[in-house]
C-alpha cells in the first residue's frame, strides 16, 4: 500500500486594475533619454543617456522614452487624431474624461439640458 502526494504550483495573474495602476505609475515616472552616437572599433554605436542628469538614472525596470508623444489636443492627419475640441467632458471627473485634461487648458462651456423621453416603465 503506497500513498502519493501531488503538489501543483502556478502563477496567478494579478487583478487587471493592479496591472493598470502599476503601468500608469511607470508611465508617469518615465525618464526622457537622448541618443548619443560615438565611434568605436566596430563602427558608430548609438547609446541612450538620461536627458536630465539631476534626476536619478533609470534602472533596468524603469520606463524610458526618447521621442515625445504627439499633441493629441490638436487634430493631426498624419496620426489620424481628430484632437479634443468639441468633445463632451465630465466637469467633476479628474480622470481622462475630465474637462481639465480633455480640454487641454482651452476652457469649456457648461450646458444644462432638460429632456423628455418615453421610458416604457411598468409600475
UniProtKB/Swiss-Prot annotation:
UniProt subcellular location? Secreted, Extracellular space, Extracellular matrix
What stretches pass through the bilayer? none
According to the UniProt record, which cysteines are disulfide-bonded?
Answer: 89-104
Q: Which residues are modified by lipidation (O-palmitoleoyl serine)?
A: 1
Tell me what PTMs the record reports for this protein. Answer: Palmitoleoylation is required for efficient binding to frizzled receptors. Depalmitoleoylation leads to Wnt signaling pathway inhibition.
Would you say which domain of life the source belongs to? Eukaryota
* Record-level Gene Ontology MF annotations: cytokine activity; frizzled binding
**GO annotation (BP), single:** neuron differentiation
Keywords carried by this UniProt record: Developmental protein, Disulfide bond, Extracellular matrix, Glycoprotein, Lipoprotein, Secreted, Wnt signaling pathway
Give a Gene Ontology cellular component term annotated to this protein.
extracellular space
According to the record, glycans are attached at 90
The task this protein performs is described as: Ligand for members of the frizzled family of seven transmembrane receptors. Probable developmental protein. May be a signaling molecule which affects the development of discrete regions of tissues. Is likely to signal over only few cell diameters.
Record-stated family: Belongs to the Wnt family.
The name under which this protein is listed is: Protein Wnt-3b
Amino acid at each position: 500500500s503506497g500513498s502519493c502526494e501531488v503538489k501543483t504550483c502556478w502563477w496567478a495573474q494579478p487583478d487587471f486594475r493592479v496591472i493598470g495602476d502599476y503601468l500608469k505609475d511607470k508611465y508617469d515616472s518615465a525618464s526622457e533619454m537622448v541618443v548619443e552616437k560615438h565611434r568605436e572599433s566596430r563602427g558608430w554605436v548609438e547609446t541612450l543617456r538620461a536627458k536630465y542628469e539631476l534626476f536619478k538614472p533609470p534602472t533596468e525596470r524603469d520606463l524610458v522614452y526618447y521621442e515625445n508623444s504627439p499633441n493629441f489636443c490638436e487634430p493631426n492627419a498624419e496620426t489620424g487624431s481628430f484632437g479634443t475640441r468639441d468633445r463632451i467632458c465630465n466637469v467633476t471627473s479628474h480622470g481622462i474624461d475630465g474637462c481639465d485634461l480633455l480640454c487641454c487648458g482651452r476652457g469649456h462651456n457648461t450646458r444644462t439640458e432638460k429632456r423628455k423621453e418615453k421610458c416604457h416603465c411598468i409600475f
